[in-house]
Curated annotation (Swiss-Prot):
Pfam families named in the record: TPMT (PF05724)
Gene name per UniProt: tpm
The EC number(s) this enzyme carries: 2.1.1.67
Family: Belongs to the class I-like SAM-binding methyltransferase superfamily. TPMT family.
Main location: cytoplasm
Name of the molecule in the record: Thiopurine S-methyltransferase
Length: 218
């Protein structure tokens, strides 16, 4: 999955992965993390997700990382937020009062940027990677997170052979096999969301499960 793939998607605005509403699992389960209002929350591969607005409304300081510059700029313009822009090593740093976004490669994001986060939220990052790259991303996420930090992970699972990702299918078995070395994992919910996703229906995907997990960095 080359960076050019995602840049092309954003420049052509082929962003079906961008949700127009706040993720229901985020609304339903975020309070389970029991974070203080001022907690710093890391959002990897954040795009221009409205979920970051929800997190900021909970009083959190949001730190996001996004590869594409247009996605970051659209987050601030779509939400009518004034921001400042500076250079932070290999990354462009965009900041407003409660949201701080780093535009660039997550694999070169300095660990000091996330060293004092207390939580993370991954809805569209893990499922963005094909299987041959997913474990590498999961290790980098773990590397960026301090021990004890809590996270809400949202995944999609479906018969991968029925549709070319992204989003890619991530099964409970994959979670168990690849995340347990670095995280304590608690499954929170799983539901079929096929009817809400016309692209999957059109491709005759037989089922599409969205699942939520509570994670704790070991």
């Amino acid at each position: 999955m080359e960076p050019g793939f995602w840049h092309e998607k954003w420049y052509k605005q082929q962003i079906g992965f961008h949700q127009q509403d706040i993720n229901p699992f985020l609304v339903q389960y975020w309070q389970r993390l029991a974070l203080p209002a001022g907690a710093k929350v890391f959002v990897p591969l954040c795009g221009k997700s409205l979920d970051m607005c929800f997190l900021a409304e909970q009083g959190h300081q949001v730190i996001g990382c996004e590869l594409n510059e247009l996605a970051v700029q659209q987050f601030f313009s779509d939400n009518q937020l004034e921001m400042t822009q500076t250079v932070e090593g290999e990354h462009q740093h965009y900041q407003t009062e409660q949201v701080s976004l780093y535009q660039g490669d997550i694999f070169t994001l300095p660990k000091r940027i996330t060293q004092d986060v207390t939580a993370f939220y991954d809805r569209a990052a893990l499922i963005a990677w094909p299987e041959e790259m997913r474990a590498q991303y999961a290790k980098q996420l773990a590397n960026l997170l301090p021990s004890g930090s809590l996270g809400l992970l949202v995944t999609l699972d479906y018969p991968q052979e029925t549709l070319n990702g992204p989003p890619f299918a991530v099964s409970p078995n994959w979670i168990e096999a690849h995340l347990t070395d670095d995280f304590e994992i608690q499954a929170l919910a799983c539901q079929d969301v096929l009817a809400d996703n016309p692209r999957f229906v059109k491709k005759e995907v037989p089922w599409l499960n969205e699942a939520a997990y509570l994670l704790k960095r070991k």
